[in-house]
């Protein structure tokens, strides 16, 4: 089954907690600090794989979770970091944040990686908190939570050439003639329900990939027929072969069909109509097709038309040669364009923008809540089981301006203040 869209949940692992431990050493208070750091939590990574053609693997399993990092140990030993979870996806997969719609990355090259949920950092142990005046610190950090994200995966077929047109204009037949692909072919509309891919190899050694896309009809860009779910596959093609039937018995106006498809491409995105296009008049082996072709050319004006018959192979070689020329031309133009965004071929890590701000809100007569990404992470990473940890957090909150902000909102001694899942009394 061809699956080109899916939704998945990814949960990275939590970082391990730092340890509070002490050495047994003569004349050193409590033996000296010896608590090791926690290990990093596992990340979730998508990897482009040239051997896959569909998102079928995600149809029945849609939740993925990486392991947590190990906690720090005694004797200054670090906890082990968790293994990353690597999920293989087809080349051509676009990854979106499901909730915001933001494009996180495009996986278009074999082996390219995208980190979609980062594992939490491990907390540091008490060996890092020793000072000349605090020789036996009972402070360690908790590990950071791993990121959670809901993703929308969308596969856009990677092909140099896309075949577009109304149903039953001969797209699948042409693909079967010029490649080794074996698409389903029948004399009824919408025989092709999923994109078919094939490789065209010319006698001169040139080659290019070709995709036969399901037939479009009027209103496709708004979801009519197979519609918009397949229009996106045209986006990555370099060249469009626009097939128009010259069968005089189908009761259709060739020029109107051509204009309708062009309108639907533009309705999806203007970028599609700016692609290189070859107009292909198909089914030229049918009696009466020459007259229909002449009328079609007259209405088109000065645009070039390539008449072919996939049955007799009339004009097919010339069409493939011209197509190869255009593919090379577009590839050269793309290579000469300055890259707008540089993306590493091997690994592209999506990172959330850092938010240093915070907000104070009154939730009751004597209660307040303070929110902010950086602030909440600070609280989550502080080990609140030890007095030293609580005192350190209080000093950091004061330096960040939280105390002053609470006073401005009217906080007084004894009021409750909540940050993340931690609640404490305000002391002025």
From Swiss-Prot:
Coiled-coil segments: none
Keyword hit for Magnesium: yes
InterPro entries from the UniProt entry: G_OBG, GTP-bd, GTP-bd_Obg/CgtA, GTP-bd_prot_GTP1/OBG_C_sf, GTP1-OBG_CS, GTP1_OBG_dom, GTP1_OBG_dom_sf, OBG_GTPase
Keywords: Cytoplasm, GTP-binding, Hydrolase, Magnesium, Metal-binding, Nucleotide-binding
Top class in the EC scheme: hydrolase
Major localization class: cytoplasm
Cofactor: Mg(2+)
Residues of the OCT domain: 350-428
Keyword Hydrolase: yes
Disulfide links within the chain: none
Annotated positions binding Mg(2+): 172, 192
GO-annotated biological processes: ribosome biogenesis
Domain Obg: 1-158
EC number: 3.6.5.-
Residue span, OBG-type G domain: 159-328
Subcellular location: Cytoplasm
GO cellular component, one term: cytoplasm
CDD domains hit by this protein: Obg (cd01898)
An annotated Gene Ontology molecular function: magnesium ion binding
Binding annotation for GTP: 165-172, 190-194, 212-215, 282-285, 309-311
One protein family per Pfam: MMR_HSR1
Subunit structure: Monomer.
Function recorded in the entry: An essential GTPase which binds GTP, GDP and possibly (p)ppGpp with moderate affinity, with high nucleotide exchange rates and a fairly low GTP hydrolysis rate. Plays a role in control of the cell cycle, stress response, ribosome biogenesis and in those bacteria that undergo differentiation, in morphogenesis control.
Protein family membership: Belongs to the TRAFAC class OBG-HflX-like GTPase superfamily. OBG GTPase family.
Name of the protein in question: GTPase Obg
Classification of source organism: Bacteria, Bacillati, Bacillota, Bacilli, Lactobacillales
Gene designation per UniProt: obg
